[in-house]
Amino acid sequence: MREVLEKQGLRFGAFMAPYHANLNKSVHLALHRDLDLVEHLDRLGYDEAWIGEHHSAGVEVIASPEIFIAAAAERTKHIRFGTGVISLPYHNPLMTADRIIQLDHQTRGRVMFGFGPGALPSDVHMIGRAQTELRTNVMQGFDALLPLLRGETVSMKTDHWELKDARCHILPYTRPHPQIFMSSAVSPGGPRIAGTYGLGLLSATTSSDAAFNALQAAYDIWNDAARQNGQTINRADWRVVGNFHIAETREQARANVRHGLGQWLDYFQRVATFPVAKPGAHAATLDEQIDAMIAQHTVIGTPDDLIARIDKLWEQSNGGFGAILDCAHNWADYPATKRHYELIAEYVIPHIQRMNDARGRSWDWAEANHLSGMEERNKGVAQEFALWEQQRKAAEIASR
């Protein structure tokens, strides 16, 4: 029987690579604004923030999600953090396991471990690796890392690292270990690996036709792999990432993204390899780019537009997912970006989670009984006046 979630249980978060595509702006200020944004999300009641790892091209400027999360956790109270994602082929698995365990303790269990093969070819080149090795490398790393997180001893050798009687000298705060997620974009490889190991699934983009269409089959691939390997998965452990910017009006949203959308598209056309923009998009006018992106499953509009988009993603997933993550792309300037997240918290989250249903029912009930209530109130007031008059007359008689 296919598992189906209730949409009102959907959680909300941000997926922060993050993107800072204007190379003329201060990266120092950008990093501190990223920390401030996480504080803002925490105050607004968001559930999660996922932080990326990148090492080249000057746009996705966080090299260590663990360092960023450690700082952000000290500034926040409730929001949970995910590594989105750690590129396992770049690291010795013992060092990665140790850092995640330490972070699990420092955050008192507010960390989730997302991993993948690495996204930027320039990163891979700089450490002397080949793109064709990455899928094998990431699973070699995970096969060593998972038992390390469980407190087991590992001896293992690959072409890039060796472990001899390796063990983590402290156990995780979260038992048996923090929740683990495998990243996925379009291919079936991510869901298949996640299912094989019983992991959560992080669908890192839904902003192209291919990625949107892949949602339809992702759960079945994930679930089939889990069943074939004696694992159990849960739709609540599925994260879906989308590209959104909302404002009070569609016109305002389009005006807001003029701040940085063009540079962001240039990055994906000229440098990065993620399928978020069609070839030649940078040659179009900005309005044409915006129209094309809206047609390609992006929201640049109002809270109602985003609600409709989430409904479509939910339908496409054939049963729902646990959290929707808004990609922190910095298309708008910082005040408009913060307002975007406020509008989601003010209007989109309450609608999806049906926070105000009870308020609406209470209003309807009170309205339906308004006239009878007024009659009863007037009777009560009249009774008080009559009692007061009775007492006044009794006092007059007594004083004679």
Regions found by a protein language model. Give the residues of each.
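Flexible, glycine-rich active-site loops centered on histidine and acidic residues
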Residues: 7-29, 89-160, 200-203, 207-213, ...
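Glycine-rich, proline-tolerant flexible connector loops at the mouths of alpha/beta enzymes
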Residues: 48-72, 87, 119, 206-210, ...
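Hydrophobic faces of well-ordered beta-strands that scaffold small-molecule active sites
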Residues: 12-16, 49-51, 81-84, 111-115, ...
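An alpha-helical appendage that flanks or caps ligand/catalytic pockets
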Residues: 1-8, 134-168, 210-323, 339, ...
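Acidic (Asp/Glu)-rich catalytic clusters
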Residues: 4-7, 42-43, 69-78, 100, ...
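Active-site mouth loops of central-metabolism enzymes
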Residues: 18-32, 86-94, 174-186, 245-247, ...
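Conserved, mostly hydrophobic/aromatic
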Residues: 12, 41, 45, 53, ...
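N-terminal beta1-alpha1-beta2 module of alpha/beta enzyme domains
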Residues: 1-81, 177-178, 363-364, 397-398
